[in-house]
């Protein structure tokens, strides 16, 4: 199923998901720097593997994904299947609602 078929996302619920499942490795604030994973500020419309100052896997660079609602929705289901060889150890979010909520939060938090 695609993002177009996903339920409407709730940014507040998405923030909780981010804090429990993503924040140990990622930051969203402008200038917040990298952790285990890259800072996600300016994520939407950016190509995978291009954040300055972060050491990406060759897989993330070579995949050249343009991040947006549709690509994030597919990626967040199963990151290792979407980008084989990614360093991201996160297993993914199986529930469409959780993915929609996280994307709604990221749209606001990374803008």
From Swiss-Prot:
UniProt binding sites for heme c: 22, 25-26, 88
A single GO molecular function term of this UniProt record: electron transfer activity
Subcellular location as annotated: Mitochondrion intermembrane space
InterPro entries the record matches: Cyt_c-like_dom (IPR009056), Cyt_c-like_dom_sf (IPR036909), Cyt_c_1A/1B (IPR002327)
PANTHER family: CYTOCHROME C (PTHR11961)
Superkingdom of source: Eukaryota
Protein name: Cytochrome c
Gene Ontology CC, one term: mitochondrial intermembrane space
N6,N6,N6-trimethyllysine modification, residue list: 80, 94
Pfam families with a match to the protein in the record: Cytochrom_C
Protein modification: Binds 1 heme c group covalently per subunit.
Family of this protein: Belongs to the cytochrome c family.
Keywords in alphabetical order: Acetylation, Electron transport, Heme, Iron, Metal-binding, Methylation, Mitochondrion, Respiratory chain, Transport
Organism name: Solanum lycopersicum (Tomato)
SUPFAM superfamilies for this protein: Cytochrome c (SSF46626)
GO terms, biological process: mitochondrial electron transport, cytochrome c to oxygen; mitochondrial electron transport, ubiquinol to cytochrome c
Function, as annotated: Electron carrier protein. The oxidized form of the cytochrome c heme group can accept an electron from the heme group of the cytochrome c1 subunit of cytochrome reductase. Cytochrome c then transfers this electron to the cytochrome oxidase complex, the final protein carrier in the mitochondrial electron-transport chain.
Principal location listed in the UniProt entry: mitochondrion
Residues modified as N-acetylalanine: 1
